A protein has these predicted regions:
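Short, Lys/Arg-enriched, disordered terminal segments
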Residues: 1-2
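C-terminal alpha-helical interaction appendages
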Residues: 6-147
């Protein structure tokens, strides 16, 4: 069993996760989206790495219902093909939260006390407004162990 598979099994404590047999070398992490906390990401199988601009431009042709995460284009890492065959944008979760935190740190209203408060608020915003919302075509958010 490779290290990424072990990490994922430890993270979710769920032996029912179905890995693709013989594809351990292509396993690079998992994605989360509303209603599905663990979508395994396999390079060149269900993950197509693209630049942010290419991913956003091409997704409109592939899946007109696909949605973007406003203001976070720099965190797009490509497309994720879901089990139902639809394709959605895939964002790097850490990068997205870091962008949110940076925006909070630039806030001059006095709403945030310090860097830790900004980080906590960024994670809260992510869980409530990104991961916690459902609409058709919502993006997925990747936790990558290897690129």
């Amino acid at each position: 069993m490779n290290d990424i598979k072990k990490e994922i099994l430890e993270q979710f404590e769920d032996e029912t996760i179905e890995f693709i047999h013989g594809q351990d070398d292509n396993l690079i992490g998992y994605a989360e989206m509303f209603g599905n906390p663990c979508i395994l990401i396999y390079k060149d199988i269900n993950f197509i790495p693209l630049s942010p601009d290419d991913a956003i431009e091409k997704i409109q042709k592939i899946n007109p219902e696909a949605r973007t995460h406003d203001g976070s284009d720099n965190s797009v890492i490509g497309h994720l093909i879901l089990d139902n065959g639809s394709t959605v944008l895939l964002y790097d979760r850490e990068s997205l939260v870091e962008e949110l935190k940076k925006g909070y740190m630039e806030d001059e209203t006095g709403l945030f006390e310090d860097e830790d408060d900004c980080e906590t608020s960024a994670w809260e915003w992510y869980y409530v407004n990104s991961l916690g919302s459902y609409m058709s075509g919502i993006p997925a958010f990747a936790v990558l162990y290897s690129k």
